Amino acid sequence: VQTCALPISKTLLSNPRVLIMDNPFIGLDAKTRDLLHTLLGELTKVTHLQVILILSKSDDIPAFITHVIPVEDRVCGKKMTLQEYLAVRKPIPERMLSEEKEARILNLPYGGDLYHTEHVVDLNKVSIRYGERTILKDLDWTVKCGEKWALSGENGSGKSTLLSLVCADNPQSYACDITLFGRKRGSGESIWEIKKHIGYVSPEMHRAYLKNLPAIDIVASGLHDSVGLYKRPRPEQMAACEWWMDIFGIANLKDRNFLQLSSGEQRLVLLARAFVKDPELLILDEPLHGLDLYNRRLVKDVIETFCRRKDKTMIMVTHYQEELPACITNSLFLKRN
């Protein structure tokens, strides 16, 4: 919330005539989205401020918007009123993943380097503090093999911190009672022994991934959990990278430099990276972040299909309930301390 509110406040203090915002509602919980909707709506009523919103999710269009210009395949359509746009907006197909691709995912062979424990994650009375602020307090949480969890909560409630513990990225985990894949943290395992079982994507990873490599190399970096590609994959591994890029509909982007892609295309590349090693545990933090409605449907289909396979476990964070796949079996809601 703070990273969103501060630039907005600074901008409004300069008394602008035009306010341009690129996907301002992404990453905000429902309460904060409503507050921002209300704030912008009131500003348009009491000032001469002209608001221009760039939105990848048309469901986020606020009621105070008067006109819409749709953009498709890098081409601007004609200007129309909001009511006209809503009347002609194309319905999203109930399914975007083809039956052929669905069968390919379901028939993927299982690797030989699997863990063999009933519990994937065990947290016992875990507390995390940063300075004077307590982020998590006495949290007990068990994720069993094959479960699919929805992790939710207000902004600042500790969701990202919790995921960093599961991903072995938080140094405070060594002082906590945490067991991952049957191995207690601090018992001699390396973070790479943990990460090899995990496929992960998040907005933070997206913002930090500034490597201007070919898209297929970004996907391949997921094989060894590196930021960048420092070990040339074997031919069969590169074939797996191309396979997953095809599943996500981005095979044509494999030789394009990552930083030259649109934000939505980059997100699809990072999703392919999360799936490329066929992980036992998927950790998806706002996986549909920044995608248009068609690709949101496609990614949701891929997630649901992947999770139908035996012993696949998932933890997914989203601020939009409608984004949760039908395979969700459990939920955890975090409250701000």
What are these regions (language model features)?
Residues 8, 271:
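Hydrophobic anchor residue at the start of the ABC signature
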Residues 73-104, 325-326, 334-337:
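Conserved beta-strand-loop-alpha-helix hinge in the C-terminal portion
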Residues 121, 135-138, 254:
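Conserved structural motif at the start of ABC-family nucleotide-binding domains
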Residues 1, 220, 235-253:
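Conserved ABC ATPase "signature" region
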Residues 19-23, 282-286:
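Catalytic Walker B motif of ABC-type/P-loop ATPase nucleotide-binding domains
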Residues 1, 231-233, 257-261, 265:
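Conserved ABC ATPase signature
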Residues 3-6:
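Short, small-residue-biased leader/transition segments that mark boundaries at the very start
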